[in-house]
Amino acid sequence: GGQDKCSQAKINILGGHSIKDDVPKYGLAVTGIIKTNNILRNNTPKENDSILLTKPLGTGIITTAIKKDLCNKATLDNAINLMTTLNIDISSISNKINACTDVTGYGLLGHLNEMCNNNLNARINYNLIPFIDNTETLAKNNIIPGGSKNNLNYYKSSIEFDSSIKKYQKFMLADAQTSGGLLLSVSNKYINEVVTFLNNQNKYETVIIGKFTSNQDKNIFVTNE
């Protein structure tokens, strides 16, 4: 369980408390000391950097399907495997990454929006973005968590979608994730090295989903090509 994952991440659990509830809950408050010259920030990408995603999306939609008893075992197992896979390998190559954030409650679009700064914009290709198997089928059937709908409503003014992107696909991009992957901003100089390293280390393929550009009207452009 949680203790196993903390041990894998070399984290000590000190204290804690339990609550009584109909729905199981588990969370951690993280404290520690770090070297300030090793910090990866979410607002420091550079123009022409590639945007990398290290895990497929879809855990919010799938966990909503689980609550409605609409999720098959294979999809459930895939989601659990993804959520219990740690994002620890990135620390080994942090000096080759310009910016980094995890994809969690604000969905890919929300966290990518936070990375856009200093007149930088993100251009991503929907067709390059990986999803857990069965996510699209569930989304087409309107199995969308409230948080994902709220995400899209909040960020939509900062995003321009290609006219071919359907509404359910927008929800998939805004899907609130639990233990999602990382969004990385990497220069052309290091892109091949970073992708090769992560794909050799991780069970999920790291994919390039777009680039950071500049001087556009919106923070994010979602294309179909």
Label each residue range with its predicted role.
Residues 1-225:
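Helix-biased detector of long, well-ordered alpha-helical tracts
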